[in-house]
UniProtKB/Swiss-Prot annotation:
CDD domains: IgV_H (cd04981). Residues 1-19 form the signal peptide. GO terms for cellular component: extracellular region; immunoglobulin complex; plasma membrane. Residues 20-118 form the Ig-like domain. The keyword Disulfide bond applies. PANTHER family: IMMUNOGLOBULIN HEAVY CHAIN. GO terms for biological process: immunoglobulin mediated immune response. This is Immunoglobulin heavy variable 3-43. Immunoglobulins are composed of two identical heavy chains and two identical light chains; disulfide-linked. Residues 78-115 are annotated as: Framework-3. Residues 45-52 are annotated as: Complementarity-determining-1. Residues 70-77 are annotated as: Complementarity-determining-2. The keyword Disulfide bond applies. It comes from Homo sapiens (Human).
Length: 118
């Protein structure tokens, strides 16, 4: 499969580990443009609700691109212009989990998606 195909794209997920801090992403799958996908990130090894959390992505052959952030309490959210109105970031501090709901997906959303802490 080539990334240039206009009818499907792959959103891949990697696991990120840094010392005792662990962020494990899940939810990657092949989706048709116009479809929806929800990514999850399970955090451990730090006090999750003390931190602003981010989603970043890396498209094939490109550098890292910041996607979105959410404040420690979920009260403030910010988005890159490229995803504004289509993506929604959320968190559940009781589950130490971060989410990214992605709607109206486009071929240019094809990337590796990572969660990150401040």
């Amino acid at each position: 499969m080539e990334f240039g195909l206009s009818w499907v794209f792959l959103v891949a997920i990697l696991k990120g580990v840094q010392c005792e801090v662990q962020l494990v992403e899940s939810g990657g799958v092949v989706v048709q443009p116009g479809g929806s996908l929800r990514l999850s990130c399970a955090a451990s090894g730090f006090t999750f609700d003390d931190y602003t959390m981010h989603w970043v992505r890396q498209a094939p052959g490109k550098g890292l691109e910041w996607v979105s952030l959410i404040s420690w309490d979920g009260g403030s959210t910010y988005y890159a212009d490229s995803v504004k109105g289509r993506f929604t970031i959320s968190r559940d501090n009781s589950k130490n989990s971060l989410y990214l709901q992605m709607n109206s997906l486009r071929t240019e959303d094809t990337a590796l998606y990572y969660c990150a802490k401040d």
